[in-house]
Amino acid sequence: MNDKIVIKGARANNLKNIDISIPRDKLVVMTGLSGSGKSSLAFDTIYAEGQRRYVESLSAYARQFLGQMDKPDLDYIQGLSPAISIDQKTSSRNPRSTVGTVTEIYDYMRLLWARVGVPHCPKCGKEIHQQTIDQIIDRLMQLPEGTKLQILAPVVRSRKGEHVKVLEDAKRSGYVRARIDGSMYELSETVQLDKNLKHSIDIIVDRVVIKPDAVRRITDSVETASELAGGLVVADVVGSDEELLFSQNYACSDCGISIEELTPRMFSFNTPYGACPKCDGLGMQMLIDPELIIPDDELSIAQGGIKASGWTSAGRETISGMYYAALAEKYRFSLTQPIKELPSEAVNVILYGTKGEPLKLHYDRANRSGSFSGSYQKPFEGICNNLERRYHETQSQYMRAEIEECMSETPCKACGGRRLRKEALAVTVGGKTIAEMADMPVGNAIDFVDSLVLTPKERIIAERILKEIKQRLGFLKNVGLDYLTLSRGASTLSGGESQRIRLATQIGASLVGVLYILDEPSIGLHQRDNDKLLATLKNLRDLGNSLIVVEHDEDTIRAADYIVDIGPKAGVHGGEVVCAGSVEDICACERSLTGQYLSGKLRIPVPEKRRKAEKGSINIIGAKENNLKNIDVSFPLGVVTCVTGVSGSGKSSLVNEILYKTIAQQKNRAKTKPGKYEAITGLEGIDKIIDIDQSPIGRTPRSNPATYTGLFNDIRELFASTEDARIRGYNAGRFSFNVRGGRCEACKGDGLQRIEMHFLPDVYVPCDVCNGKRYNRETLEVRYKGKNIYEVLDMTVEEASEFFANLPKLRAKLDTLLDVGLGYIKLGQSSTTLSGGEAQRVKLATELSKRSTGSTVYVLDEPTTGLHMADVHRLIHIIDRLADAGNTVVIIEHNLDVIKIADHIIDLGPEGGDKGGTVVFAGTPEECAECEQSYTGQFLKKLL
């Protein structure tokens, strides 16, 4: 077998016809600037071809379900294995997907609870046992010899009704007596039962005496009673109060509730057999949220303090205004009073109605026929009930979307957010229900499995299941995810977390001879846990697999067996193999930027002095969201603050859920529901908050950097102002590819046409009318400085900056894109082709190009994702520019180069999950380095 993957003439995206040999069965790291072509080589060439060849070996029928990769643009490749890609984009958005289901641990848990679980009554909590006829007889024969018994069939247990048919059937079957509500009756007499009361009826099947030769008779009687009562038998010991109840089913003798036989599907929230019927197994329900109806209680109703579809206006001429006036009159409050000063009874009535009590409504209308006024009486249903009713009745998507703005996800009241029906939640293993184990952090779940006490019989049944569960939990712990719970929704995980979960799942699969391609697995991981991740990667390699990791993290690069540095720069200036070999080879290479940072020739300096917080601070008091332990935190204004801590310590809960959502709600008038906290102060000096994350700048291929930054509007105005356009009567709309007029109608302005290929991937070909140029011929005839609109959109930012050098407005926006290191992207490049890091930098550039108010709070969540050390250097300059203008920058980050340039650090921890959520340290980086309790400080000390 080849010991190398040999590639010749790779030309995907910006790759410049490169030839390279990569060793197999090794840990290979590909590095280089953002946009240099690493992903083009790793994913679009090696993975695409490995996957395509594997899929091509399957039947045509199977291929149509798998979705085939396009053949990459290259001359030759050999030495490939079947390829598995673990990137960051494919984390599930399905609300049914959890950490437990993704890793398959939950499937083994379902099997465990079905095989060795102990059922309890969902109503009274009493343990339920199932017994066979033989077990019942054995128990009865243990009674002292000579004991007199009555064998009864409990046909009715605490049910309302006259039960005439039950008694008639028993009489017809030859039974003579029955015990009704504890008293004996002859079935020959007429028994009158009150149909409104609950009754219990036991038919007397036989009277027996316990002795060895009576076994046959007792067995027959027990079988008969069981048949009559659907598996239940009562043995009444004559002359004493003792009564034995037996069940052949899982049924509670006291409550009469029976549960079906335990099966794995009973514990699945994705099947009707196990899912909570109220929330269909989602654990959450969308309900009207009063906090979103009254987002700011400092305002009065007259000032528009109520923000709900159909209820915003307090004007007398509107229906809502009529109701408000009537409510104010009846409950004695003023519509100009701030809502927080209204009596609680009044607020309650506004939200939940008058409970059938009529209100006196006055109307005063005027139209062409004249004016008319009067009054009438009508109860008020309340805003919450009104929105709920309209939401379920309306057919209008617009109306539903409007009402949804007042709704939030609330844990289901029936199952308490645990997704399962009550019968499944009443089964325990080791005293815990399946939902309780799913809610444990991985570390605690390992302890629980280790400490399980089982009977010898249960141990034999559960041995293999427990081994699988423990092994998979161990893999999650090894990739630094021991703070996650198995019930955590997959859609709430960060890119790095979901990637490491899939990595743990792959190790669990124990495949050999596979080519794994990973995209920055260290994202979101604290330096403390990096060693665990590297050990996991080496473990995969040692099993006999080849690993190609696209990575910027210094520890990972240094741990690699072989490094491929792509560059030297980004975009059109990249796409070459700058250097390949060991760490020493890379460090010795003059052309390699990576080598220069690794060797220390280039580095990000520690700032000579740090900004002082002179504008006050934002203070959050009593933060309790997720695992935050009722903490008080201050964010100084006008400086750069880094929020650090190990994975799962509560950084996102504090910054994204509380700080961002609260300020967005109060300053940006956003309809967001912040996380739990007591109070927030210090917002007077802020005008808005902006979250610059790595989500795409647009969801469709039609959106691009030019449309996002506003450049496209300026360019279209420029073309519309040319003499040629004015003669033809073209306005700016003519130069848009999104609307009729100037666009090519054959491809609707896409530039491409899709051709459906059955059994093969769909083929996109350039439109044969416009040749992929998106516009019709007349529009393309209009030129500015010799270029038409298509040619301008096809320019890189760098080229456009020179082209528009004498237009200050355009030049300013282009320069900010250059400043953030995006000179290589094209103005019209589809936003779907941009990486997360590139999308974030387009957003940063857009913010930089706006006039700064000096009172904005910027939130950046791990902005160094996908960035090379040189890109991080550039990012730091941008962050400094934002802060130097007086703005406040709050960054969640693990990258030490960014942490060391911060003016203020808030370190959360000390651990993740339950053991996190407290403030370990707050102060300058220098002070943090001296804090022994801070993991971040320990790593920071080496850099300062």
Model features per residue range: what roles?
Residues 1-944:
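Conserved phosphate-binding elements of NTP-dependent enzyme cores
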